[in-house]
Amino acid sequence: DGAAAAIYSDRTGVYVGSGGGNYQNQYDYFPLMTEAEDDLPTFGAELSNNVNPMWLLRTLPNNVLGHIGIRHLLKGPNACLTNHSVGGTLAVIEAAEALRNGEADRAVAVGHDAPIEPQMVLYYQRMGLIASGALLPFDARHDGSLFGEGAAALMLETEAAAASRGATVLGEILGGGYACEAEGLVAIRDDGDGVL
């Protein structure tokens, strides 16, 4: 009924993690940047004449969060986390915390990204993170990773919410955590200070 649907909608959260968004849409204004030659007033005055007015909205990583909420009428707590390759994992951790803290009865956690863009490949290659040949994640000869597009969603709910619909509980998230050592994108402090 309508009342139950409203409660479901208000008590269902959405947590989305991504690597950061679609940078190719920012290419629209690169020619204008070159022409303006660091003259910000000129750049600002000509921006609306040279760039699609939706360019910024097309690049936002929280678009996925918005579309999920709108499509499924989910109005509970939500967050968009952009943190390179761990964004999806952070979304699961945040969704589980929302359930544990009583902010929601259920939450969908989503991870997505499509980082295959020239500047990202170059950036990761210069850091030595791109495999020189085949991807060999479990081989002693592995020497990096490869980019790929992907998305996954996981529906989490409290034990009480599962019981109310007669669902079998398949697993439990006991905890999760993350840290920032401010040492760089992939660096970890020798003393592991931020991890402990």
Report each predicted region and the residues it spans:
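Conserved beta-ketoacyl condensing-enzyme motif
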Residues: 1-72, 77, 112-118
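Active-site-proximal alpha-helical scaffold in enzymes
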Residues: 1-3, 61-72, 78-110, 147-167
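Flexible, glycine/proline-enriched loop segments at strand-loop-helix junctions
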Residues: 49-57, 78-86, 142-146, 185-186
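Short glycine-aspartate micro-motif
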Residues: 11-15, 104-109, 135, 170
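Acidic, glycine-rich active-site loops and adjacent beta-strand->loop/helix elements
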Residues: 18-21, 83-87, 111-116, 175-180
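Short acidic, glycine/serine/threonine-rich loops at helix termini
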Residues: 25-29, 92, 117-123, 183-186
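Condensing-enzyme catalytic core mediating Claisen C-C bond formation in acyl metabolism
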Residues: 130-196
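Short, hinge-like loop/turn segments at secondary-structure boundaries
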Residues: 32-33, 124-128
